[in-house]
């Protein structure tokens, strides 16, 4: 699929701004949506809409089946072992908060350490800060060098017998650093420390295999990978979904409610309280299909090639490393309206 053909899949690019074709370079913030995703949301509301997991009428059965089909597609897409390991959330932020809250409540005590890096987005720092305030945990920061890379030997030195969680980004949203996940997870396994990966930038630009990565948790932001807003995914190993307590209380996450006792459903229902984002979940299946078929979306070499072409134009300079360990280095651009790099047009 050529680039022009890919761009034609997005209705928003039919418009012009100030007489010029729309050029959008903010997908790391939020990606535009292909027509297939937009159409699927409309189709679902027009023909199949119902709440899921609550009723047995025809529309409810259809909606529930579509909802659960997407869970199976996600499982396959990231190569999870069990469908119970796929939990739908409101976003990657909620996915990380879910882990910090439930794991923290059960396993973190005063003085325990949580190891993050200096590259983390607020979404992978603030939830752990809450644990620091609530439980007396200690947050340790693994430093990075001037190119935004971590030194794995220095990283090892930060791990102690009190380390109870390692949480870090897959790909930095600032520098484009691709983190050495497998080196960290291999190290963590020897010490029985769970690892959470913030995959907000990693999921749209990687061929994901969570079993190969060896992480315990992986958070995904769907609106950054051609999907609808207000939807995220938490991958959590079955060991953890079986052990962790519910995150929120409400309909759909219980087996039985009595006046003096409540029994909870198994995962994933245990972590999906209340009315879910049904249309968004159903439409996200189309997003994954698009990402799978698109030769640019999930191949880091395409993004790396783009950044190298931009730098080669001599109109930009990298503010971080331009090595193969980086997806897209942070760059500064200097141009006049008549000298926009050809890679942008």
Question: How does the language model describe each region?
Answer:
Residues 1-296, 305:
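Pyridoxal 5′-phosphate
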Residues 298-345:
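Low-acidity, Ser/Thr- and Arg-rich intrinsically disordered low-complexity segments
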């Amino acid at each position: 699929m050529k680039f022009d053909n890919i761009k034609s899949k997005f209705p928003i690019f039919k418009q012009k701004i100030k007489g010029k074709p729309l050029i959008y370079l903010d997908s790391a913030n939020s990606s535009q949506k292909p027509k297939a995703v937009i159409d699927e949301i409309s189709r679902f509301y027009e023909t199949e809409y119902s709440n899921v997991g609550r009723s047995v009428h025809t529309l409810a059965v259809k909606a529930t089946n579509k909802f659960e089909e997407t869970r199976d597609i996600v499982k396959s897409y990231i190569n999870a072992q069990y469908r119970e390991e796929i939990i739908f959330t409101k976003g990657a932020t909620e996915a990380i908060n879910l882990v910090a809250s439930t794991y923290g409540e059960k396993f973190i005590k005063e003085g325990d350490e949580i190891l993050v890096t200096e590259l983390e987005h607020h979404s992978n720092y603030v939830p752990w800060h809450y644990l620091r305030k609530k439980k007396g945990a200690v947050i340790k920061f693994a430093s990075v060098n001037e190119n935004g890379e971590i030194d794995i030997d220095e990283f090892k030195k930060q791990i102690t017998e009190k380390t109870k969680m390692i949480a870090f980004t897959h790909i930095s949203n600032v520098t484009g650093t691709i983190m050495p996940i497998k080196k960290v997870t291999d190290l963590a396994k020897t010490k029985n420390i769970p690892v959470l990966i913030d995959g907000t930038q990693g999921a749209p630009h990687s061929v994901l295999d969570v079993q190969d990565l060896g992480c315990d948790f992986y958070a995904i932001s769907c609106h950054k990978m051609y999907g609808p807003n207000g939807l995220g995914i938490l991958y959590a190993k079955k060991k953890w979904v079986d052990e962790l307590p519910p995150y929120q209380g409400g309909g759909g996450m219980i087996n039985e409610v009595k006046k003096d006792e409540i029994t909870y459903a198994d995962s994933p229902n245990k972590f999906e309280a209340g009315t879910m984002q049904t249309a968004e979940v159903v439409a996200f299946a189309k997003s994954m299909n698009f990402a799978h078929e698109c030769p640019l979306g999930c191949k880091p070499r395409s993004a790396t090639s783009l950044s190298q072409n931009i730098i080669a134009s001599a109109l930009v300079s990298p503010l971080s490393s331009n090595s193969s360990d980086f997806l897209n280095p942070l760059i500064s651009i200097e141009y006049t309206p008549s000298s926009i790099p050809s890679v942008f047009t």
